[in-house]
Structure formats: C-alpha cells, structure tokens
C-alpha cells in the first residue's frame, strides 16, 4: 500500500474517480475525460496580471494540483502537489477567424492528459479575433 508519493500523502480515489479509472482504458482515447471551456470578455487584458492571477488560483486550489499514481498492486491513489509557478500559455488568435480559434481550442480538448504524476488541468490565455480576451480551461 502506497503511503506517500514524491513526499506527498496519498489518498484513495473517490467513487467517481474509480469509475473513470475503470472505464477509461476501454475507451479509444483518454481524452473522453476532457472538458474544455472558454471564458472571455470584450476588454483588453493585462496578460502578466492574468498569468499571476491564474498562478494564485493554482496555489489556492488543491483540486488544480491533484495527481494520480498507482502502487505495485495496481491500485490508484491521488495526491496533491505543492504550489509552484505554472507556465501559462498564451494563444493569439486575433489574426484569424473565430471559427479557426474555436477549432484550435477543440483540438486541444482532444489531447489526453498523462495520468501518472502529471497535471490534470491546462489553462491557456486567449486573444480572440472578435476583440474578446480571456482564458480557455481544460
């Protein structure tokens, strides 16, 4: 039985997490677990301040820092990493169309997350062609 992972206490999975781990290997892609959404506003943003704010959210929210691991017997566990500065991506879609931007964001959603010892969230700061700016959460 795993007690710690990379110096962090481990916890059993919730019923919902166990269900995901049960059916996910039978799916064509682990991206079946991904949900992507954008949040934008029609105003110019201070991108450095937004990046700083996103990192503060990561620091405050343990749920955004959950990682999964398996022990030698194959049992899944979860653990929470310490806060660290994340490299927040920026995508400038202002030179294209809204449809092209949406297609790219949909493509991001098709990429599965690594399930072992890796982040399970992704946030991209986005500048849209229609003058809206914000973030894409995945």
Where are these regions (language model features)?
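Acyl-group handoff/entry surfaces in thioester-processing enzymes
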Residues: 3-81, 95-138
């Amino acid at each position: 039985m795993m007690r710690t992972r990379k110096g962090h206490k481990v916890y059993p999975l919730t019923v919902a997490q166990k269900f995901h781990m049960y059916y996910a290997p039978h799916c064509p892609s682990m991206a079946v677990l991904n949900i992507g959404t954008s949040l934008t506003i029609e105003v110019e943003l201070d991108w450095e301040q937004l990046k700083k704010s996103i990192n503060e959210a990561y620091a405050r929210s343990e749920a955004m820092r959950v990682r999964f691991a398996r022990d030698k017997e194959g049992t899944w566990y979860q653990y929470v990493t310490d806060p660290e500065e994340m490299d927040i991506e920026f995508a400038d879609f202002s030179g294209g169309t809204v449809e092209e931007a949406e297609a790219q964001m949909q493509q991001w959603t098709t990429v599965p997350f690594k399930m072992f010892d890796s982040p399970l969230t992704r946030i991209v700061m986005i500048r849209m062609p229609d003058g809206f700016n914000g973030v894409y959460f995945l």
